Amino acid sequence: MILDAITRMFDRAFEKEWYETYWAFDLHGTIVKPTYNSKGDTEYYPYALDVLRILTKRPDIKLILWTSSFPEEIKDFLKEFELDKIHFDAVNENPGISSKAGNFGYYEQKFYFNVLFDDKAGFNPNVEWKQVYDYLVSCEVIKYLPDPNWTTKH
């Protein structure tokens, strides 16, 4: 399911000459395994860390952490992500999308993303992180992933 969304997004990004795409990630039950206690969730699902590290390195992919965690929990997770070499470009907001520009529509209250990783939206972290990892690695090998500077070549 998520691979279909990713491949369609890459195709559309190339077709529309988008210079950035926005990938949103839920935290609990998607990136980390929920523990349902006050100590916090700190165990990553297998391959989640690997995928997020690959995506963090791409300047054309903006990562959004989309979570209902409390502000102090978010700060703690962001510190943990930084130690794990993962960078989120935004937390619970739309990076780089302005309703004032008028070319994307009105996004002051609507969440904007191209790909959504969320267990509540059907993402199965026990299976799909590995699929996404394998896909991204195979794309790197055959150079399928778009060049971050591809728009300058047109």
Task: Give each language-model segment a name.
Residues 1-154:
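HAD-like aspartate-dependent phosphatase fold
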